[in-house]
Every structure is written in C-alpha cells, then in structure tokens.
Regions:
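Active-site bordering "gate/hinge" segments
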Residues: 1-294
C-alpha cells in the first residue's frame, strides 16, 4: 500500500486513462469498480465538451497545485510525482491533467481507494473510486478492524509502515502530495447504526488514535510536510438534479476565473479577518443563517 502511494510505475489507472477510447464508456468497467448513472453521466457530459474546455478545466486544477507550492514558498522542482484522486467519469479531465503535470516535470501516482479493513479509514475513500452501490453497507463495515485491532496489531502495522517507507524512501522523498477532484450533489444519506455491526471499544478508539498519530509522523518523516502541497477542486454529479449540465457549466466558469484577480480579493479578506475577534454571518432575505464565529 505504501508503494502504491509513491510509485508511478504502478500505472493500472493511468494506463486506462491514457490508452482507452474515452468516447466509448465501456472503459469505465475496466477498473472493476461499481459504475452508476453518476459515473456514466459525468463521462457523457465531459465528452460533450471541446478539448479546449477540457484543457482549461485541467489547467485550473494543475495550476492550483503549482500555485500551492509557490504561495507556500515550497520548491516544486524538488518533486517528481503527484497523487491524483478522482471519481470515475472524470477521465477526460484527468488525462489532460496528467499531460499538464508532465510538462511541470511531475509523473502521476494514481491508486484505488483502500478496500481491505487493514487499510480503510471508516467509510471514507481516498484514491480513485467508482459509485457506492450500497452506502449502508459501507457504513455498517466502517469499523470492521475492531475484529483485530489490538496493541500487537498496532505495533506490527507501524513496523511494516516503517519498513516499507525505508524501502521506498527515494520515491517518497520526491512525492509532492495530492491533487484531489471531489464531487458534490449526492442525494442525502442517513445511515442507521446497527447493533450487528462491529464497533470500536473505548480502548480500541484510543489504539486507533495512537495508530493514526504514529503513522502520520512516519509519513511526515518520508514525505516531508514542509515540502509538499495539495489542491482540491469540486464538481457536481448528475444526482444533483435535472439541471446538472447547467450547474456543471457554471461551476466550470467559477473555477476558471482569473485567480490572480481573485487572489488579491481573497488576501484582502484574509488580512481583514486577521484583525477581527469574531465574525457574524447573517442570511439575506428568507435565508435564516445567523452564525457567530470566534
């Protein structure tokens, strides 16, 4: 699993993205992931866009990553790889991003979200992922590691992590961090807690916290936090409603605004907020939002 996160030679997903006919949606099934109308809908919509539009979307994403290094005063030239995380259906955009990252001197690392309980973190998915066939199932099994989580397991996993990072230290040292494509618009899901599901005991919760803290420190020693960066961009999926194409196009417009112009506006807001003790947020018209943030 450590190697998957830093080695561009493990190119299962990259090969699908670069060498498939993306106009033929059957490529989606090559991943072995669940494919729903969200994945096919996004792919169909992106296929309706011109290459210029796709390149512009990808450029916003890749430039955001590059600018993260610049604004953080970090040297991107030290890095040779970037981790792309995305939802199936966005392959046209990801393909353009892969090529643009190459122009920056970065190879792409793309791995599947964790499947085994040893590597999963609750029901959250990091990596490339398809649809979720049964959200309740994912929720029910979010703490299956309660089956085996004990002090000995924590020690073994941390030792294995350390050994793996030692083996792939050179690859980890030149890894730049994640570039994430998130989605929104999913229908609300209210999980039901079931007594049959495995759940952490209080002692296991402390063990999991210890494991998270220690594994984070190990990762930071090899993929140095002060040298890496990230970017996140988000797009809607068809589940958002019948206005999906229009909403998607409007999000593209927002994402492709001149960042230099709005960077100045954002910095002005940040500088002003730095002088405040609290901020009061009130809704307009029928919006009843009333928040006080300290």
């Amino acid at each position: 699993r450590i190697r998957e996160g830093v080695d561009p030679e493990l190119d299962f997903a990259t090969d699908i993205i670069l060498n498939s006919d993306l106009s033929d949606l059957r490529y989606l099934y090559r991943y072995g992931e669940f494919v729903s109308e969200n994945e096919t809908g996004v792919a169909e919509f992106l296929n309706s866009l011109s290459q210029e539009e796709i390149d512009k979307m990808a450029s916003t994403y890749t430039e955001g990553y590059r600018m993260g290094f610049i604004t953080g005063r970090k040297d991107i030239t030290k890095k040779k790889t970037v981790n792309i995380r995305y939802h199936l259906g966005f392959e046209r955009m990801v393909k353009a991003a892969v090529l643009q990252f190459r122009e920056m001197g970065l190879q792409t690392v793309i791995y599947r979200h964790a499947l085994h309980a040893v590597n999963r973190r609750n029901q959250f998915r990091n990596g490339f992922t398809g649809g979720i066939a049964n959200p309740q199932f994912d929720y029910d099994h979010r703490q299956d590691s309660a089956l085996f989580l004990d002090p000995d397991f924590v020690k073994r996993k941390l030792r294995a992590m350390q050994t793996s990072y030692d083996e792939y230290a050179d690859l980890a040292d030149v890894h730049g961090g994640p570039a994430v494509i998130e989605t929104f618009g999913e229908k609300p899901f209210s999980p039901v807690s079931k007594p049959e599901s495995w759940a952490f005991t209080e002692a296991q919760q402390k063990l999991q916290l210890e494991l998270d803290n220690e594994s984070g420190q190990i990762t930071n020693r090899y993929i140095k936090g002060e040298e890496r960066s990230f970017t996140i961009i988000a797009y809607p999926i068809p589940e958002i409603g019948e206005d999906f194409p229009e909403i998607f196009r409007e999000i593209v417009k927002i994402n492709t605004l001149d960042y230099k112009k709005y960077q100045k506006i954002q910095q002005t807001i940040i500088d002003t907020l730095d002088t405040c003790e609290w901020v009061e947020i009130k809704g307009k018209g029928e919006n009843e939002t009333d928040l006080l943030i300290h």
